[in-house]
């Protein structure tokens, strides 16, 4: 009687985690392979997936709520972005609004701190 792939899969699916771990180790020894995931460098899709797995280094500063002290928040938005008064006012009043994109982590956290101290709600994406 020949064993089919389905029989093998059924047998493996009934193993406990410990038994499965031992089986993987035996496969590695017998066939000289490793069960570690392979990192593929190259294409844009692979690069994006690898970047997502690592710690994020660039952030978008998104103002989700201008808060009660809108004048203070507008002043900070103008200082951070270089926007004119009308544009900064619109950004604060029409939330959510992205204030800056692709900002370094330290700069993004500092901007978030300043805006939150003025009463605004901010997300780093």
Swiss-Prot record:
One of its GO terms (cellular component) is cytosolic large ribosomal subunit. Signal peptide: none annotated. Keywords: Ribonucleoprotein, Ribosomal protein. The keyword Ribonucleoprotein applies. Disulfide bonds: none annotated. GO terms for biological process: translation. One of its GO terms (molecular function) is mRNA binding. SUPFAM superfamilies: ClpS-like, Ribosomal protein L7/12, oligomerisation (N-terminal) domain. PANTHER family: 39S RIBOSOMAL PROTEIN L12, LARGE RIBOSOMAL SUBUNIT PROTEIN BL12M. Belongs to the bacterial ribosomal protein bL12 family. Homodimer. Part of the ribosomal stalk of the 50S ribosomal subunit. Forms a multimeric L10(L12)X complex, where L10 forms an elongated spine to which 2 to 4 L12 dimers bind in a sequential fashion. Binds GTP-bound translation factors. Forms part of the ribosomal stalk which helps the ribosome interact with GTP-bound translation factors. Is thus essential for accurate translation. This is Large ribosomal subunit protein bL12. It comes from Campylobacter jejuni (strain RM1221).
């Amino acid at each position: 009687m020949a064993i089919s792939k389905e029989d093998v899969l059924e047998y493996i699916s009934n193993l406990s985690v410990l038994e499965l771990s031992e089986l993987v180790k035996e496969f590695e020894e017998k066939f000289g392979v490793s069960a570690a995931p392979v990192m593929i460098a190259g294409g844009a899709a692979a690069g994006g997936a690898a970047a997502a797995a690592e710690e994020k280094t660039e952030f978008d500063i998104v103002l989700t709520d201008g808060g009660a002290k809108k004048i203070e928040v507008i002043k900070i938005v103008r200082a951070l972005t270089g926007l004119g008064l009308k544009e900064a006012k619109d950004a604060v009043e029409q939330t959510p609004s992205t204030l800056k994109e692709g900002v370094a982590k330290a700069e993004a956290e500092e901007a978030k701190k300043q805006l939150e101290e003025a009463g605004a709600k901010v997300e780093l994406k």
